[in-house]
Amino acid sequence: MKHFEANFDGLVGPTHNYAGLSFGNVASLSNAALVSNPKAAAKQGLQKAKALADMGIVQGMLAPQERPDLYTLRRIGFSGSDANVLKQAAKEAPILLNACCSASSMWTANAATVSPSADTRDGKLHFTPANLVDKLHRSIEPLTTGRILTATFSDPHYFHHHSHLPEHNSFGDEGAANHTRLCKEYGHAGVELFVYGQEATNPNAPKPQKYPARQTLEASMAVARLHQLEDDNCVFIQQNPDVIDQGVFHNDVIAVGNQNVLFYHEQAFLNTQQKIDEIKRKLDTELYFIEVPTAKVTIQDAVKSYLFNTQIITLASGEMAIIAPTDCQENPAVFAYLNELLTLNTPIKQVLYFDVKQSMQNGGGPACLRLRVAMNEKEITAVNQHTLLNDALFNRLNTWIEKHYRDRLTTQDLADPQLIIESRTALDELSQIMKLGSVYQFQK
């Protein structure tokens, strides 16, 4: 049976804006209050996804969440008509309104952690939505994320969906952005790397001092248990607290893996050699550990360009390609390193550059925009076929974006009651296009 790694990219929602909500995310904070272009953002993401589909990669799309989130605003005491709720919130708590209007669900690397059936005891694909408790604007996502994932991967014979972890900092979980999987072939049992920022229950363990560690060891271990993984399928690695304090808020900002390749910065982890030795013991195949030295690429350049927030994909030829943001081309040190990388003895033979600037300015590169799901042929057949990107769906989504999205949005515009109507109209139509059923609260 054939096996593939599919990418499920998040459609950028109609309220994409720059509110600078993510403390610890340098790009998000430095671009706060810029005027955004939701239409361009959605099209950039869709075009990147379509380019991968055209390369033969199995490519799906995940629907955005309903924003503004009036349900959360009502839970915290704003009342009256929808328009009045927005007006009140804008006047009394503009930062809370901004949080309830964020389009951050576009970064589906944070949607969930996924373990393929080749790794799990029950032979099913497992999904656990991330609770994202560290950031208010993201902590309101998990329930809807779970509904969208269940509507996309709906057959219980193949797919096992878990609830998100308890909503407490001890179980802070940021999903696949802190998880990667190494294997010989996608259909073979692999080793899942769970990267965490701190041990919540051990006050003496290393942790960052300036910015929060969003992922705990306790959360990573809980997900591994839920997914029925054996010890031989797991390696738990602590991210270097010093790089978290330099703006590396998720591991996918400093490392990325694919099949038998782990591409990472030399400062990415604690106890790096010990963990590499553990991976080698647990995965009996030829492995390529590509360590990028600080002398060639500084942490600052890695964060600014998102060198590691790239996708590594395996092409039909068996060679690998890096999907990088154009920001990597524009950074001399990073561009020079990527050109050098292509001359080294590794499976990576191409670098392809994509413009995802609207996402980058909010702190999310190509890897943030996708959730990886390794599947076999039967599992792909069991996926909701209306979520898989082909020419017909691409054209429908492009037309949908053109019809419903604004090309200019400021944080002041978030209080416009018309935005509620526009968003709900768009999402209602999208749920019909993608045959999702009633995944949004306004549809219930």
From Swiss-Prot:
EC number(s) on file: 3.5.3.23
Enzyme class: hydrolase
Active-site residues (renumbered): 174, 250, 368
Gene Ontology MF terms in the entry: N-succinylarginine dihydrolase activity
Statement: the UniProt record of this protein carries the keyword Hydrolase: yes
Pfam families: AstB
Reaction equations catalysed: N(2)-succinyl-L-arginine + 2 H2O + 2 H(+) = N(2)-succinyl-L-ornithine + 2 NH4(+) + CO2
Binding residue positions for substrate: 19-28, 110, 137-138, 214, 252, 362
Pathway noted in the entry: Amino-acid degradation; L-arginine degradation via AST pathway; L-glutamate and succinate from L-arginine: step 2/5
Statement: the UniProt record of this protein carries the keyword Hydrolase: yes
The organism's place on the tree of life at top rank: Bacteria
Keyword field: Arginine metabolism, Hydrolase
Example of a GO biological process term: arginine catabolic process to succinate
Self-association state and partner proteins as the record states: Homodimer.
Function of the molecule: Catalyzes the hydrolysis of N(2)-succinylarginine into N(2)-succinylornithine, ammonia and CO(2).
Homology family: Belongs to the succinylarginine dihydrolase family.
Name by which UniProt lists this protein: N-succinylarginine dihydrolase
